């Protein structure tokens, strides 16, 4: 779940009904508590208005998702893949009595200073950390597109999209 939607109650409720691992990214200001709160919420049962298999409205009841983790994506201010940051993220989860303190590190976004070419630097550092400590994290994320850059999707201008370039 992305940095901007980690605070969304709807996303937290939907995740609570999934029986698979789901990651919540720290927000773009670097706050771990928001992702921790999202994990806490998704761990619990929820009841909300949804749509049934026939397309009608219904009340959906979930049992909670115990397989959530935090994704460190950096922030608009700094990176957060270093040892101190990973420790702080895990402490945020531990201090809130979460039984799992799983962290995945995103090599892109704020951790690459929004330059895809820096992902290899982040990955090299993480390889060293994982070699020293197998519990450093549960994995890494890399961002890859066929062509570099990003583009906006503008209503009615789908034909102007460039192939293989991220739509943001």
Short names for language-model regions:
Residues 1-88, 109-110, 114-125, 129-131, ...:
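Active-site-facing alpha/beta catalytic cores
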Residues 91-95, 163-167:
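Catalytic-site microenvironment of enzymes
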Residues 60-62, 94-98:
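Acidic (Asp/Glu)-rich catalytic clusters
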Residues 96-98, 132-135:
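Short helix-capping segments at alpha-helix termini
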Residues 105:
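Conserved, mostly hydrophobic/aromatic
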